[in-house]
């Protein structure tokens, strides 16, 4: 689900990490992702025990955000806080921002919110392997991307 992001993506995210959040509909995207991933349940455990919390973080994705936060001099939290709704939401915002920056670099344009979710769900490399195309996504990811695009007024 949440594949490892390269160190290059982390470096890109260090440069104005929060800029993307202000240019898009981040609060709405966060709400949609939490609804899709866990029905807004901070105690959720999925993916055979590998995904935790409202945003269904895997340990490696959580660690990527912790590493970024440490480099930025920000508080990094233990993986057990994936079940803390406030902490997990902050981590999800950072992680979606990392993904957005990575997709921007790879796609040569700012990604749509549904594309960010597709990369969140499939991994950035997994989404790249699918040619960044909606039509190539698995049906369950297509349904979620359609929900996000519709809610945020985006085209697929």
Model-derived features: positions:
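Secreted/periplasmic proteins that engage bacterial cell-wall peptidoglycan
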Residues: 32-74
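Catalytic and substrate-binding regions of cell-wall glycan-acting enzymes that process beta-1,4-linked
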Residues: 111-156
């Amino acid at each position: 689900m949440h594949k490892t992001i390269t160190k290059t993506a982390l470096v890109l995210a260090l440069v104005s990490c929060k800029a993307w959040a202000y240019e898009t509909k981040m609060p709405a995207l966060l709400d949609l992702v939490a609804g899709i991933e866990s029905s807004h349940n901070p105690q959720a455990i999925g993916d055979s025990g590998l995904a935790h919390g409202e945003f269904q973080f895997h340990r490696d994705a959580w660690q990527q955000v912790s590493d970024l936060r440490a480099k930025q001099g920000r508080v990094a939290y233990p993986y057990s806080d994936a079940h803390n709704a406030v902490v997990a939401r902050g981590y999800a915002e950072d992680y979606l921002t990392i993904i957005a920056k990575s997709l921007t670099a790879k796609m040569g344009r700012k990604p749509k919110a549904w594309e960010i979710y597709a990369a969140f769900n499939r991994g950035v490399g997994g989404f790249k392997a699918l040619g960044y195309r909606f039509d190539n996504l698995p049906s369950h990811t297509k349904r979620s991307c359609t929900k996000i695009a519709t809610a945020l007024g985006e085209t697929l």
